[in-house]
A protein has these predicted regions:
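Peripheral, non-catalytic segments that deliver or gate enzyme domains
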Residues: 1-177
């Protein structure tokens, strides 16, 4: 950090911001007229906000979106969701990929999922074919070949997960509804 204050004001954001790994860009979600985050923009530090690039727009009014980073700091994830359905897009740190995020899995009514990246794999937390959720994974270069890593367990809700050096930490709730 060079301890400089950035005075580039960006209005009408949701407060959801993500710095690029190279510190050249700032990704943010912009609010629509109903005060819902529906668009993701890329702002290049040191440029005028009016030149920011729209990189994602959620067209379905039921859904809102946000952006975040992966645990291994190799990918960015745009998550869009409503109460029971979600969808994720991703891109890497290549500036050309910012403008065309890749769809991970097409949304399916009633299916929720989130994605992270660690150790050469995408890790998926989902309720697809798993009422109480499961954790699946696939290699970065083969997102069509997803396999269960921690399958659904009867009466155990598999919650979120995070990664530490060589460990995955997950939460589970017994006798979950």
């Amino acid at each position: 950090s060079d301890n400089k204050i950035i005075d580039e004001e960006i209005k009408d954001t949701s407060g959801n911001i993500t710095w690029s790994y190279n510190d050249k860009f700032l990704f943010y979600s912009k609010l629509d007229q109903f005060h819902r985050p529906r668009k993701i923009y890329c702002h290049e530090i040191g440029t005028q906000v009016k030149n920011d690039k729209l990189i994602f727009e959620e067209k379905d009014e039921r859904f809102t979106c946000g952006i975040g980073t992966s645990a291994d700091e190799k990918f960015y994830f745009i998550s869009t969701s409503e109460h029971t359905t979600s969808e994720v897009y991703f891109f890497n740190d290549d500036e050309n990929s910012f403008l065309k995020p890749t769809l991970f899995i097409k949304r399916e009514e009633g299916i929720e999922y989130s994605v992270d990246s660690w150790n050469g794999f995408f890790w998926i937390h989902t309720n697809k074919d798993a009422k109480d959720f499961k954790i699946s994974r696939c290699k970065h270069n083969d997102i069509k070949n997803i396999s269960d890593f921690i399958p659904s367990k009867k009466d155990i809700m598999i919650g979120g997960f995070t990664f530490l050096d060589k460990w995955m930490i997950r939460s589970e709730k017994n006798n979950a509804l």
